[in-house]
Structure formats: structure tokens, C-alpha cells
Amino acid sequence: MPSVYTTDRFERWFGSLRDLSAKRRIQARIDRVEDGHFGDCKPIREKVFEMRIQHGPGYRIYFTLHGSELVILLAGGDKSTQIADIEMAIREARQLEDKK
């Protein structure tokens, strides 16, 4: 079962959500990831994946994997900010790689 860690960027995004129903759904999705069930996900590029949450404006969580035991949540957003969020997540993933 993978361990899930978050970046400060992800924590700020998640903390800023006002829709409590969305927060519950997103947290439930993260809990399922910890059980090894990723659900609706697709690879983006450079080891960054997009997890889609079908609620409200179409929430997205961007993450990377380190082996099979570690998931790092890089950033979040919704369909309206998807392009910028992907670029931000890729930058976060690169910074993590550089710190290795």
C-alpha cells in the first residue's frame, strides 16, 4: 500500500477549497489511493499523473510516483485551470527530482 505525501502547494490549494462536499470527496479519493486504488487517472508527462474527480468544476489532483510505495500529491485545480496546473505540477516534480 502506498504512502501519500503532499507538497506545500497542494496543501494550500486543498485548504483554500470552500466547497465542503468537494473536500470530502477529494479526501475520500486520497484515502482510496492509500489503499492502492487510484481510480480515474491518466499519465500527463514527465512522471506526472492527473487524478480526475467528477464533482463540481471537475477537480484535478496532480501527483508523481516514487517506486510503488510513495505517492506525492503535487498540486490541485479544476478543469478551468488545467493547463496552468499541469505546468505547475511538472515544475514541482522536477524540483523534487533535483533534491534527490
Regions found by a protein language model. Name each.
Residues 7:
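PIN/NYN-family metal-dependent endoribonuclease catalytic core
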